[in-house]
Amino acid sequence: MKNKDYPLRSSMDELSTKNDNEIDLEKGPLPEYNSEDGSTLPPYSEIWKYIKTVSEDSSTGPTEIANPNVERRQEFKDSHPNIYSLLRLLISVLAVIVVFFTAWVCVNPLEKSIFGKVAFSVTIGITCPIVFIVIFCFFETWTQAVAQCIKVTVIFLAQCVKVTAVFLAKCVKVIAVGLYNSKKDLVVTIWLAWVVICFILFGCVKDGRLNLNKALICSTCSISAALFFILLLVCIPIWTLKHMLFGLFQVLGVQSCVVIVTKGLMYLFDKHIDATGYEIEASSLFVIGNFLFFYEMERPGALKRMPKFIGNGIASFLGGLGNAFGGIGNAFGGIGNAIGRIGNAFRGANDNNDIPLGEMDVESEV
């Protein structure tokens, strides 16, 4: 019998041997791993990679966030050193000049005594070089400080503006809600103020102390427009701007119609537009404005319904006139019928008077 020799290595051993013989061209041959030393790890293991990354991060330390403005300034300084130095010198000289002239204007040493002039000269002689040295030598430091101060100031002002705008918006909202809830009392107050203003204007014009002429009607229209603008702001919610403007234009339209009709009547009756004409015109607007004012106050939204109301009123008026004329016609018809009946009665009486006497005797005997 022949003895068969079987290999003592398994397939896993062959695979590991094959992997050991292969060399990674990027990493190079693997160094020998000392299993007896517990502190040594394979250089390409995952734990080794992690430890190496952490050690590199700790050695470099925390990275600072670069300021783009500082980087740009440093780049400009490195690329143009002469221009940068000249700029520093120019700014330093300008600062010294500003300090000198400010001190000169505030103190005015020419009006001082000799001791005052000497003190001023010594003070300026010490202050100006210090200012020049500080600005020139610490240019980057104070420019960064000024830039940071400006940035903080701008942010603070923006926050103040934002807070103020929010506060004013809330105040306007609260005032609008308050006006809407207490509109009747406020409307009466506005109306009384408007009446007082109009009477003051009319009184001044009447006494001759104020010669407005054409300005009178314009001022009256302006007062009326402002009044109804406030009125519509109060009676109608503030966010319905379309309805408010619609009502305002309606009031102005009514006032314009009154002005046109008044002037037309004055020209029709050969009445020239003078002070009296303007008083009549303004009084008409005053009466119309008061009527519309109270009507709108008692029935909010009346101005919006005014065209339909006027149309219905005109239709009702014409219908009433038609019914009146129809009634008058019916009355005249009734009178005609009564007159006809009276005529028939008279005709019957005349027919009875024309009967002969012999026929009357026969009828009586029968």
From Swiss-Prot:
Bias kind Basic and acidic residues: ranges: 1-29
Role played: Promotes unequal transmission of alleles from the parental zygote to progeny spores by acting as poison/antidote system where the poison and antidote proteins are produced from the same locus; the poison component is trans-acting and targets all spores within an ascus whereas the antidote component is spore-specific, leading to poisoning of all progeny that do not inherit the allele.
Protein's UniProt name: Meiotic driver wtf4
GO cellular component: ascus epiplasm; cytoplasm; endoplasmic reticulum membrane; fungal-type vacuole; vacuolar membrane
Sequence intervals crossing the membrane: 89-109, 119-139, 149-169, 185-205, 221-241, 245-265, 275-295, 309-329
Family: Belongs to the WTF family.
InterPro entries noted in UniProt: WTF
A matching Pfam family: WTF
Gene behind the chain: wtf4
A Gene Ontology BP annotation from the UniProt entry: meiotic drive
Subunit structure: Homomer. Forms protein aggregates. The two isoforms can interact with each other and with themselves. High sequence similarity is required for their interaction.
Keyword flag Cytoplasm: yes
Keywords assigned: Cytoplasm, Endoplasmic reticulum, Membrane, Toxin, Transmembrane, Transmembrane helix, Vacuole
Protein origin, superkingdom: Eukaryota
Renumbered residue ranges of the record's region Disordered: 1-39
